Amino acid sequence: TFLGLGLEEKPWGPVFSMSNLALRTAAQANGVSRLHGEVSRNMFRHLWPGLLAEEVPIGHVTNGVHTWTFLHPRLRRHYAEVFGPEWVERPEDPETWRVEGLGEAFWRIRQDLRLFLVREVRQRLYEQRRRNGEGPARLREAEKALDPEALTIGFARRFATYKRAVLLFKDPERLLRILKGPYPVQFVFAGKAHPKDEAGKAYLKELVSKIREYGLEDRMVVLEDYDMYLARVLTHGSDVWLNTPRRPMEASGTSGMKAALNGALNLSVLDGWWAEAYNGKNGFAVGDERVYESEEAQDVADAQALYDLLESEVIPLFYAKGLEGYSSGWMSMVHESLRTVGPYFSAGRMVRDYLALYERGALWEKEARARLEALKAFAEALPAFHALGVRPEVPGDLTLNGGRLEVGAVLEGEVPEGLRPHLRVQLVVRRLGGGLEVVDLEEVAPGRYRTAFRPTRPGSYTYGLRLAL
């Protein structure tokens, strides 16, 4: 029944799951990053009870952003001049990102974009305070907010609790030491919570409250009325893009891709798209890939890792300026970020992946009638699959014969013609602490199958036989 397609049993009773309905009726399914695909396979493995998590048919195509939409016009012109016409035609091609040619002119544009960001923040902060009825002194302070020359870290996205906007305040004394240090650092926060997300709205209020409580309004600004224009100003002008989700809650995220396009460096937890983009030279990874059982322990560990990065890597690298007026080490990291993020996390690459992995239209049209007939026969025969069984034939002592394990199987039950082309007998082997291997057995006689498995590494193995379609 229709309701059965979405049915899921919960401890409190049956519920109708739209996710279950979609996965049971879709021809294809995918996550929007490599990690999201992995998480989704584990989340929905109950819909494929005969498969291991690695085999659940949910793939992934990592999100990408449209280069021309999110790249600042001045940088677009500069990139076109430096990279050449090939880049304009094929920005998703890694070979066209000749980043070595970027130099002082690129840095001057970056300085101008930061200045524009600071001016926009001042104007919005002034209007924000005027609208809230704050006094003349507070309005004058807004007109001088932030430093156009200081390292500027942006954080702009939907305010959900798992995104942990207040992670910076986990150790207030450590944060104050960083902000009151010899090098100026400033943060700009912007975003909205979903209207029905009361916890997210409370999180936003908590962020504003903590900034006021610790007297950091000269170094930290929270802007209201977040919109697409402000999002672009922030991704254009920030030097660093901060992202602190609680792993593995972030499906993909795209704001960091937009910031990287414009020359910012990502400072992010290894979640979503950054888990596959980070290579150790193109930005900064907060913490590692561990997931703690306790959210509190996770927050403490990630906060300490964030403070360490700011103190020992991000801030010193940005201010290690040479005679040319900028840090060559910082510029090298920006080059690597542009080279790796620009082409690989573009909408062009994303669309190409979808076409290659999921678009079957032309093939289906060509073979539509034959497929429909085969599908009809398969559907009619499918109920008989559950009556089939497989009996193993293996040596009693499991002695390896010349380094191989000889495995045989006998099929039990009558196989309908509609299932015969699709039926497979498989040996499933897993090494203790290692990965999974699946080997199809060869039919050597009617209803009898055999294969030989040769371990590639020493160790303890578990194995089993199964029927698959």
Regions found by a protein language model. Name each.
Residues R404-V439, Y461-A468:
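Beta-strand-rich binding/interaction modules
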Residues E443-T451:
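Aromatic sugar-binding surface patches on proteins
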Residues D397-G403:
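Short, solvent-exposed loop/linker segments at the N-terminal edge
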Residues V286, F453-P455:
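Hydrophobic residues in beta-strands and at strand termini
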Residues G361-D397, G434-L436, L469:
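A structural signal for beta-strand and strand-to-loop patches characteristic of beta-rich domains
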Residues L398, L441-E442:
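Short, exposed beta-strand/loop patches in secreted or surface proteins that constitute
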Residues G447, P455-T462:
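Short tyrosine-centred short linear motifs in exposed loops/low-complexity segments
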Residues T1-R369, A384:
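Catalytic cores of carbohydrate-active enzymes across secretory and cytosolic contexts
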